UniProtKB/Swiss-Prot annotation:
Binding site for Mg(2+): D449, D451, D453
Record's catalysed reaction(s): RNA(n) + a ribonucleoside 5'-triphosphate = RNA(n+1) + diphosphate
This protein's name: DNA-directed RNA polymerase subunit beta'
One of the record's GO molecular function terms: DNA binding
Length: 1204
């Protein structure tokens, strides 16, 4: 018996008639389903119990044998085997067809496989198969050619003239005869010869034919199997018939389609027995052919067969296709038990690793565990009474539940799960009510808020699953975001505001300049009203919580600080610097010396002479968390986060910051600014009327005048604002809102865009505080409506992008420690003009150096090759003035089906080296797809024609990853050389580039802006005009490296412009997947076929083999595939079929007899194996446990953090 859960590969092929018969348990002869009186299946019908097995467990059709003791007996009255009813899901039947029919996938698919094998056009095939023309199968000694088509008239004429010396036939029988006559070896050799000379159309046709014929030859499939003599009937439980309440029956469409086939087949048999006229028989055969077509793929040819209400019936192909098909609905997405969902509410008193689970929900989810425990504790005698106790909710059940859920993590998931932080594990605590309580800090990761969001709970059952949930998925472990390595659990909103308020300073506050002996005394004074949180005071430096970074000399001095900052620093680890000002040096090194004062000094004077120090905003809090994480790892960080959260909530409550209409102060000088702007606009309009400037220049100038006016107002507003204005505090702290919201409230709303995205030159001069006029309000509605429509579209687009990205990279897994490559990537800062988009430091951190880097001046070694570049080293490299560094990169990694640890570098989510088995492809896809919803949808419209619209945001990302021809394409140079002249020709310009060997002339399209000047030296692949380069063009004129770098740079540009940071390595993984195929140009002496797409590794393997034999290697050129195309070209047919174009992928795979080696994640999910990543990898599965001596360690019970 084969082990269903453990096999090495999966193969697909064409089924021969004998194979179909061997699967079958009997022939279905009648179209009947069930008897309408007895409701029992009819004998020999589509639900026959003799063929498919009994309907009830261990019971035959006539009832002679009942009970399990007759297992395996075949009833002598009704012929039904006594067995489980489950076999009705696996036993197949068959229909013996009275005439062969063609399989529509192979005849109708594009390209038509049958047509390629026979070298006939699909049109001709259709005429033969559907009985419109005869085809010559044997020409004999007549002037006819084999495979020649004859009409009815011609056929009769030739029959009269030549008698029976030639043979011609119609229908699938004729095609079958032709397919059987093919000598594959002969055809293949003939085509290979032809390829040496053929050109153009003939060559492409020959390549296509060769590919199909080679597939047949190598796979052992026979071409004649594309014609069916026997039709398999799938098991009845997979096409069920169920009784509805009203006594009517609902049935699967397949039964209708099968019934049509059986009816026509039986009628054809009868006609043949009667010896009916050929024209009637032909018509019946055609109808049989159409019935089988409809069963296999309804609607592929002609009009689909419809059921009641003109609804097309769902055929076998439709069962596989699309979101509702077998692949995506049942194999890749299953419903799971031990799960529940409920509304979420905030749980501010939870610890980082906890969540609140409603009592009734927990009881239902942990039922089996509670039952077992009840029996073990002797509270119930057996499982049945334990179950009864739970159903009656008796009081002792709750105590048992408490002990069961202790230490048993549960998973919380919020849809849409855009990245892996959308599912995290928590320790449950029981809460009253029916809502799940969620820790406020994990909301960012889930993108959750409490306006009615719901979340699902799942229970990990096995001890391995629990261990994984606790060690890898616990919320306290997931502090960093996998996309950029920055903390994702930063406080937000109230928490930020509270900590901001806590660390404010106010000159002249009550009790300024008082000196206290320690923190406690200062707090006492605060509680009794002698000082305020914002009061600047002094305490002995040695008395504060985290004084370990102070020098001995500093410890003898007084530390100038505020009461609030004393409280804030209490939450930090002892060896962390005392944070007194929001600067990088204070965070990373130590408290600045200016805050230490000798004990005898006049404290009040010293304080009065100082400026107020800025409070800590959201960004600083984020930096503090990152720094604590870097030094103290997980346990300490999550403790500190909880304390920071508590402080934030406590002091935002104390602060009582509110917003009232009186807080919005309208700017006094606004009218003057607007008058000035209006005067400038009038002047521009005058110039335009006199014909001094064009319409376009006028428009641009007007827009810029109003934009400047708005900026001036914004600047003055921000200056005039009181630093303690509640709205200002909210925006300054990063809790809510920004400067632009402010300007709209108190300054002016500014310019708006119309529905097409063009800016309307009439500005909205009012602010919300003053109120808008009717026209202004109307103009504003455009933007508001477009915003809402965009958001809805964007979500769907972004989700689809993520799906394609996941699909193309799902098999990229870290497979080994070092691939030993000698290649690398030369990187520098990414710039757009003079603006740095991504600094060298950002690109270096967490990567391995490919070559040793030395200081340009001193020559000291900054980093050796193959060593990890840490934050400090990266900073040193940048400070040394090094511009470019050679690093290891996923682009140049030699590992098959994945990457190696060295080329990938550090795992951003943990801040440590990446582990073997990490599914970096999926993480990359999630990291690029998840921020997709934050990107804009807009294409910027610069008024008029010139400088075509530049695509930005999400559409641009799709354009890059799908390798489409970009909008507003730039012209690039194909050679190195010098720009000699730029000529004006008619209505366009021409750029002449002179190289060492040849001179090229490039026509510049109308309206494009030039980027080069005469006399400038340029290199191949360089842009001559502004715009986006077409990466396919770039690949033709340069090499792979240039294309990889270009794509990486462009993706980073789009995301960084929108303020989204993504690690380079994620983009590298995706781009690598787009460039892993080559197209063979010349096969040399290898077995590969010219014109085919091959994986780079397959190609090099084939070449290595012939080179060792001293023969001619093949040549190929790299191909850039868009992600959709790349997913469909993957080696795994299961993965490709479950992605898109299911029928096409399966048709192709069957003919080639493809083997799926099950290397990716999707394939394994589909067949129900563990995914070969993480702990599912073979190297982690075959682990033996060795019992070691238990070392005596005292573990505090209430802290369950796990160090990584």
């Amino acid at each position: 018996m084969i082990d269903v859960n453990n096999f090495e590969y999966m193969k697909i092929g064409l089924a021969s008639p004998d194979k179909i018969r061997s699967w079958s348990y009997g022939e279905v002869k009648k179209p009947e389903t069930i008897n309408y009186r007895t409701l029992k299946p009819e004998k020999d019908g589509l639900f026959c119990e003799r063929i498919f097995g009994p309907q009830k467990d261990w019971e035959c059709h006539c009832g002679k044998y009942k009970r399990v003791r007759y297992k395996g007996v075949v009833c002598d009255r009704c012929g039904v085997e006594v067995t489980r009813a489950k076999v009705r899901r696996e036993r197949m039947g068959h229909i013996e067809l009275a005439a062969p029919v063609s399989h529509i996938w192979y005849f109708k698919g594009i390209p038509s496989r049958m047509g390629l094998v026979l070298d006939m056009s699909p049109r001709a095939l259709e005429e033969v198969i559907y009985f419109a023309s005869y085809v010559v199968t044997e020409s004999g000694d007549t002037p006819l050619d084999k495979k020649q088509l004859l009409s009815e008239k011609e056929y009769r004429a030739y029959r009269d003239r030549y008698g029976n010396t030639f043979q011609a036939a119609m229908g699938a029988e004729a095609i079958k005869k032709l397919l059987q006559d093919i000598d594959l070896d002969k055809e293949v050799d003939f085509l290979k010869e032809e390829l040496k000379t053929a050109q153009g159309q003939r060559r492409t046709r020959a390549i296509k034919r060769l590919e199909v014929l080679e597939s047949f030859r190598n796979s052992g499939n026979k071409p004649s199997w594309m014609i069916l003599d026997v039709l398999p009937v799938i098991p009845p439980e997979l096409r069920p018939m169920v009784q509805l309440d009203g006594g009517r029956f609902a049935t699967s469409d397949l039964n209708d389609l099968y019934r049509r086939v059986i009816n026509r087949n039986n009628r054809l048999k009868r006609l043949l027995d009667l010896g009916a006229p050929s024209i009637i028989v032909q018509n019946e055969k055609r109808m049989l052919q159409e019935a089988v077509d409809a069963l296999i793929d309804n609607g592929r040819r002609g009009r689909p067969v419809t059921g009641p209400g003109n609804r097309p019936l769902k055929s076998l192909s439709h069962m596989l296709k699309g979101k509702q098909g077998r692949f995506r609905q049942n194999l890749l997405g299953k419903r799971v038990d031990y799960s529940g969902r409920s509304v979420i509410v905030v749980g501010p008193n939870l610890k980082m690793y906890q969540c609140g689970l409603p009592k009734e929900m927990a009881l239902e989810l942990f039922k089996p565990f509670v039952m077992k425990e009840l029996v073990e504790k002797g509270l119930a005698h057996n499982i049945k009474s334990a179950k009864r106790k739970i159903e009656r909710v008796q009081p002792e059940v709750w105590d048992v539940l408490e002990s069961v859920i202790k230490e048993h993590p549960v998973l919380l998931n919020r849809a849409p799960t855009l990245h892996r932080l959308g599912i995290q594990a928590f320790e449950p605590t029981l809460v009253e009510g029916r809502a799940i309580r969620l820790h406020p800090l994990v909301c960012t990761a889930y993108n959750a808020d409490f306006d009615g969001d719901q979340m699902a709970v799942h229970v990990p059952l096995s001890s391995e699953a629990q261990a994984e949930a606790r060690l890898l998925m616990l919320a306290a472990q997931n502090i960093l975001n996998p996309k950029d390595g920055k903390p994702v659990v930063t406080p937000s909103q109230d928490m930020v505001l509270g900590n901001y308020y806590l660390t404010l300073e106010r000159a002249g506050a009550i009790g300024e300049g008082m000196v206290f002996k320690d923190t406690n005394e200062a707090l006492l004074a605060y509680q009794n009203g002698y000082v305020h949180l914002h009061t600047r005071i002094a305490v002995p430096a040695s008395s504060v919580n985290n004084n370990e970074t102070f020098t001995e000399e500093q410890k003898g001095k007084l530390l100038l600080t505020t009461v609030g900052k004393l409280i804030f620093n209490e939450i930090l680890p002892k060896s962390f610097p005392y944070i007194n000002e929001p600067t990088k040096s204070n965070l990373e090194k130590e408290t600045p010396a200016k805050y230490f004062v000798d004990k005898g000094a006049n404290i009040k004077e010293v304080i009065a002479s100082r400026e107020e120090v800025a409070p800590f905003n959201k960004k600083i809090l984020g930096n503090i968390i990152a720094e604590v994480f870097k030094r103290f790892k997980i346990t300490e960080t999550s403790r500190m986060l909880d304390r920071m959260k508590d402080l934030g909530f406590k002091y935002s409550t104390k602060a009582g910051i509110t917003v009232g209409v009186a807080d919005i102060l309208v700017l006094g000088e606004k009218d003057e600014i607007l008058h000035e702007a209006q005067a400038k606009v009038d002047k521009v309009i005058k110039q335009f009327r006199r014909g001094l400037i064009t319409e376009e220049e006028r428009y641009d100038r007007v827009i810029s005048i109003w934009s400047n006016a708005k900026d001036v107002i914004q600047g003055k507003l921000m200056k005039s604002l009181d630093k303690r204005n509640p709205i200002f505090m909210m925006s300054d702290s990063g809790a809510r809102g920004n400067a632009s919201n402010f300007t709209q409230l108190a300054g002016m709303r500014g310019l708006m865009a119309n529905p097409s995205g063009r800016i309307i030159e009439l500005p909205i001069k009012s602010s919300f505080r003053e109120g808008l006029t009717v026209l202004e309000y109307f103009i504003s509605t455009h933007g508001a409506r477009k915003g809402l429509a965009d958001t809805a579209l964007k979500t769907a687009d972004s989700g689809y992008l993520t799906r394609r990205l996941v699909d193309v990279a799902q098999d990229v897994i870290v497979r080994e420690d070092d691939c030993g490559t000698d290649r690398g990537l030369l990187i520098g800062a990414i710039k757009e003009g003079n603006e740095v988009i991504e600094s060298l430091y950002d690109r270096l951190v967490g990567r391995f150096a490919r070559k040793t880097v030395k200081h340009p001046e001193t020559g000291e070694v900054l980093i050796r090759e193959n060593e990890l570049i840490t934050e400090d080293i990266a900073r040193a490299i940048e400070n040394a003035g090094v511009e470019t560094v050679h690093i290891r990169s996923a682009f140049t990694c030699n590992t098959r089906h994945g990457v190696c640890k060295k080329c990938y570098g550090r795992n951003l989510a943990t801040g440590t080296d990446v582990e073997v088995g990490e599914a970096v492809g999926i993480i990359a896809a999630q990291s690029i797809g998840e921020p997709g919803t934050q990107l804009t949808m807009r294409t910027f419209h610069t008024g008029g024609v010139a400088g075509d619209d530049i695509t930005q945001g999400l559409p641009r990302i799709q354009e890059i990853f799908e390798a489409r021809n970009p909008k507003g394409q730039a012209v690039i140079s194909e050679i190195d050389g010098v720009v000699v002249t730029i000529n004006d020709v008619k209505d366009r310009q021409e750029v002449v580039v002179q190289g060492a060997v040849e001179t090229r002339t490039y026509a510049i399209p109308y309206g494009a802006r030039l980027k080069v000047t005469p006399g400038q030296e340029i290199s191949h692949g360089q842009e001559l005009t502004e715009g986006s380069i077409d990466p396919k063009e770039l690949l033709k004129v340069t090499d792979i490296t240039a294309v990889q770098e270009y794509l990486l740079r462009e993706v980073q540009k789009v995301y960084r412009m929108q303020g989204v940071e993504i690690g380079d390595k994620h983009v590298e993984v995706m781009v690598r997947q787009m460039l892993r195929k080559v197209r063979v140009i010349d096969a040399g002496d290898t077995d590969v076929l010219p014109g085919t797409l091959l994986d780079i590794h397959q190609f090099t393997d084939a070449n290595v083999k012939v080179l060792l034999e001293g023969k001619q290697p093949a040549t190929a050129r790299p191909v850039l595939l868009g992600i959709t195309k790349a997913s469909l070209e993957t080696d795994s047919f299961l993965s490709a079929a479950s992605f898109q174009e299911t029928t096409r992928v399966l048709t192709d795979a069957a003919i080639k007899g493809k083997r799926d080696e099950l290397l990716g994640l999707k394939e394994n999910v589909i067949i129900g194996k563990l995914v070969p990543a993480g702990t599912g990898m073979n190297r982690y599965r075959k682990v033996d446990l060795v019992k070691t001596v238990q070392d005596d360690t005292n573990v505090e019970n209430d802290e369950i953090y796990v160090e990584q």
